[in-house]
UniProtKB/Swiss-Prot annotation:
Gene: Pheta1
Lineage: Eukaryota, Metazoa, Chordata, Craniata, Vertebrata
Domain notes: The F&H motif, an approximately 12-13 amino-acid sequence centered around Phe and His residues, is essential for binding to OCRL and INPP5B.
Function recorded in the entry: Plays a role in endocytic trafficking. Required for receptor recycling from endosomes, both to the trans-Golgi network and the plasma membrane.
Keyword check for Phosphoprotein: yes
Pfam families, per the entry: PH (PF00169)
Protein name, as recorded: Sesquipedalian-1
PH domain residues: 17-113
Subunit and partners: Forms homodimers and heterodimers with PHETA2. Interacts with OCRL and INPP5B. Interaction with OCRL may be important for endosomal morphology and function.
Motif (F&H): 191-203
């Protein structure tokens, strides 16, 4: 069998999940001692590296047409991978513990396609027995999801694998609340001219009220003429404040007092 070395090296160190990985002791050929190697199982291929972080594998074992069995060896927790045919030498491996031994034997025994074919055959027999035993609940010969074509959405046809549900009449939405209408006692809606005249009267009344207030403030004004304070007091009586100051002129809300020093005591 011809294999691409680059493809195997990439497959051995890629980021895909592995079926099993760990350190095993591998016995060399011609009765040499064992070496501790890092083994990685991916599918039906067993890679072994010099160390855990090595970038290239030292070797590869294709797990097809082989059996995994326990052996008596110098190493504890030893097992062997044997191939059919007298020319193929077995691979004797040893784990660090009993749990690791059981895990490796189970994983290697289930790695070949031969094991998968046996599993598929067993499942087919169980399925046939279930169909014969319960005809009422028999499964269809070729179960396939029902594809229901749906209308196009955004130019693409949407397919659904779910079974069709019984059609149910859609529930009507709750009725909308009635609109507010003008009562019959109020008569027809007023026109724009009527509204303009009605609110115009109110605006005019407010303007007249404001003008009346302005006229009342203007009556409190005292005209001021240039001259001395004595001349001003002779023409008109002066208004006195709480401190005896004479008020010469009143500007609606602002007063300009001139205090008489002689009137502080009065």
């Amino acid at each position: 069998m011809k294999l691409n070395e680059r493809s195997l090296a990439f497959y051995a160190t890629c980021d895909a999940p592995v079926d099993n990985a760990g350190f095993l002791y591998k016995r060399g050929g011609r009765g040499t001692g064992s070496h501790r190697r890092w083994f990685v199982l991916r599918g039906n291929i067993l890679f072994y590296f010099e160390a855990e972080g090595s970038r290239e594998p030292l070797g590869v074992i294709l797990l097809e047409g082989c059996t995994v069995e326990l052996v008596d060896a110098r190493e504890e927790f030893a097992f062997a991978v044997r191939f059919a045919g007298g020319r193929s030498r077995p691979y004797v491996l040893a784990a660090d513990s009993q749990a690791a031994l059981e895990g490796w034997v189970k994983a290697l025994s289930r790695a070949s396609f031969h094991y998968l074919r046996l599993v598929v055959r067993e499942l087919e027999q169980q399925l046939a027995a279930m169909r014969e035993g319960s005809p009422a609940n028999a499964l269809p010969a070729n179960p396939s999801p029902v594809l229901t074509q749906r209308p196009k959405e955004n130019g693409w046809v949407v397919w659904s694998t779910l079974p069709e549900q019984p059609s149910v009449a859609p529930q009507r939405p709750p009725p909308l609340p009635p609109r507010r209408r003008a009562s019959a006692a109020n008569g027809p809606l007023a026109s724009f001219a009527q509204l303009h005249a009605r609110y115009g009267l109110e605006v005019q009344a407010l303007r007249d009220q404001w003008r009346g207030g302005q006229a009342g403030l203007a009556s409190l004004e005292v005209p001021w003429h240039p001259g001395s304070a004595e001349t001003q007091t002779q023409d008109q009586p002066a208004l006195r404040g709480h401190s005896g100051c004479k008020v010469l002129h009143v500007f609606r809300s602002v007063e300009w007092p001139v205090c008489n020093p002689g009137s502080q005591g009065t």
